[in-house]
Each structure stands twice: as C-alpha cells, then as structure tokens.
C-alpha cells in the first residue's frame, strides 16, 4: 500500500487556530426554546479546535507549533499546550480582549451541542500572521480550522512559502468558500461539512464512498479524509480508496473525537505510515478520547494508543 510521505527531513507543523476556555455542563437533555434547565455538573476545560488538534499532533509525536491569540484570562491555556509538548512562542497575548470560549452541553448519551464566542480568536492581525510565517519553510505543514479570522491571508502566506496545507473546515460556514480550496493538500472533514462544500442537499442515507468521490473529483490533487461518526471513516488519495471502522467503546464525551482523529491521522501520515495504518491509529486514539470526559484532557498519548486493545 502506498505511503504518501516519506519523512526524510525534519518538518514542523504549524497549527494556526483557536484557543478556547470550555464551560461544560452535564445535562439530562439539550435545553429547548423557552426552557430553563438545571445542570447536574459544571467543569471548566481548555479547548478550541486549534488547541485540541495541536495537543493531538504533539501527543502523536509531531513537532508542533501553535499560533493564535488569547486574552489575559486564558494564560492557563498556554500551560496545557506546553505540558503536551507544544511550542507556544507564537501565541499572542492581548490585554483588551477576552479569550474565546465555548458553552458545551453534554447529555446522558454523551452527545454535545456547542455555542462559541470568538473573542481573541477573532483578533488575529495580518502583522501577527507575517511574524508567524517568518519561522517556517517549504518543508513544513500548516493545519487550520475555521475558528479564527484572517484565514485567506494565512493560506496566502503559507502558499508563498511553499508549505502544504491541511484544512479541517469546522465549524462550517460560508467563510470556508472564500478560501482557495484548490490549494488545499489535505481535507479532513465530516459528511455534513463535505456536503456543504459540494452544495449538496442532505440525502436520506449517507454514502461515504460517493461523497468522498465527489470531493475527490472537485479537488483531485488533495487527499480527502471523510469521518462518518459511527460508520467510521474513508479516505481517497490519488487512486487509493481506504475504509476504516470505529473501535466501539462506551461513549462519555464526543467533544474531542474529531480533533483527536485529525491530529493522529496527520501525524501518522507525516511519520511515514500508510493511509490504512494512519486511519487505524487515528480511530483508536479517537475511541480512547470519547471514553473520557473533557476535550483536551481526553486526548491520549501515543503510548496509550499503541497499547490499546478493544
């Protein structure tokens, strides 16, 4: 089976993304319109898709640099990143803006719904972007999501340098379509995000092979990884098509499932694994993550994943 990347040089990953404080409420059910609901429990965690994916990459063995912005109330987020081995020198601390945060409801089934406040995540400046990219070369990779501003400029700067770009278009909205998507090297996304990029109406039944095939037709030079929840994941890269089932566990909290998968898949590929090997490792890591409470704290270390038996 083809190995996409042979790691012959020292490469770095720049995760230019969000840094959030997560307020997680344990509830019997998601609150409805007009309803006042008492939470059974409140926990405060570090979060943000950018932070989660940086931690997943680092715990999976990659040299990871995080760029982004926080307010003075978010200094503890830097400690979490540093503890995971992520370089935080490129995170800007803003005195007059609050750190981004998320209000997360977790129900009895382990599902969640999330309200985001952008805060410092929406205060990225072009000057900061210019400063960040001074530290990277065409040997390096950029990972982005959709929780910060200035994404088109970030992609432009990365391409000027010659970096390869990995996109996780979450949360999905019209801003994603403002990006030069034909310049993306890796797409990691779920079926809903994929259908929105394709301007498809949601079908009665999700066909991962069909949807990923349409994406591959639209972006033939990119590697497409489509996550399908309980149905696993599929990947198309060149002429290769691979399917991966999930590892079944008791679900506690799905918040970091996708972020864990993203980090571990990318780390696997860049460390020379085949697509199948990288998908299998990512699925194991994601299974461990959903069996635990919290976002960043639930992301496993590589040693745990390698020892995992279902």
Question: At which residue positions do the language-model features occur?
Answer:
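Conserved phosphate-binding/catalytic region of the ribokinase-like
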Residues: 3-7, 174, 205-310
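Short, glycine/serine-rich, charged loops/turns that create anion-binding
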Residues: 20, 71-74, 108, 119
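Positively charged, low-complexity intrinsically disordered leader regions
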Residues: 6-33
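Active-site metal-binding loops of divalent metal-dependent hydrolases
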Residues: 19, 49, 260
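Short glycine/proline- and charge-enriched loop/turn segments
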Residues: 31-39, 190, 242-245
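Substrate-binding N-lobe of the ribokinase-like
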Residues: 4, 13, 33-101, 303, ...
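Residues that scaffold the ATP/ADP-binding catalytic core of kinase and kinase-like folds
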Residues: 24, 115, 196-198, 289, ...
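Ribokinase/PfkB-type carbohydrate-kinase core domain
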Residues: 7-16, 79-93, 105-242
């Amino acid at each position: 089976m083809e190995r996409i990347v042979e790691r012959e040089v020292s490469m770095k990953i720049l995760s230019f993304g969000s840094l959030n404080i997560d307020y997680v409420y344990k509830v019997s059910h998601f609150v409805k319109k007009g309803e006042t609901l008492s939470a059974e429990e409140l926990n405060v965690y570090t979060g943000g898709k950018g932070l989660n994916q940086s931690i997943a990459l680092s715990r999976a063995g990659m040299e990871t640099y995080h760029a982004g912005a926080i307010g003075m109330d978010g200094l503890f987020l830097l400690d979490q990143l540093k503890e995971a081995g992520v370089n935080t020198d490129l995170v800007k601390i803003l005195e007059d803006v609050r750190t981004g945060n998320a209000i997360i409801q977790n129900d009895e089934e382990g599902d969640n719904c999330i309200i985001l406040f952008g805060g410092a995540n929406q205060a990225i400046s072009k000057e900061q972007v210019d400063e960040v990219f001074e530290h990277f070369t065409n040997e390096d990779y950029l990972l982005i999501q959709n929780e910060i501003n200035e994404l088109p400029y970030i992609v432009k700067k990365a391409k000027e340098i010659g970096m390869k770009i990995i996109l996780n278009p979450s949360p999905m909205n019209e801003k994603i379509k403002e990006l030069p998507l034909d310049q993306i090297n890796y797409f990691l996304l779920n079926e809903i995000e994929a259908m929105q990029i394709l301007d498809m109406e949601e079908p009665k039944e999700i066909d991962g092979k069909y949807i990923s095939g349409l994406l591959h037709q639209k972006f033939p030079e990119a590697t497409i990884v489509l996550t399908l929840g309980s149905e696993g994941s599929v990947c198309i890269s060149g002429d290769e098509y691979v399917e991966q089932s999930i590892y079944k566990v008791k679900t506690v909290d799905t918040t970091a499932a996708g972020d864990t998968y993203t980090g571990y898949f990318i780390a696997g590929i860049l460390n020379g694994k085949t697509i199948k090997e990288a998908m299998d490792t990512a699925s194991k890591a994601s299974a461990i993550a959903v069996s635990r409470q919290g976002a960043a704290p639930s992301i496993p270390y590589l040693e745990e994943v390698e020892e995992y038996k279902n």
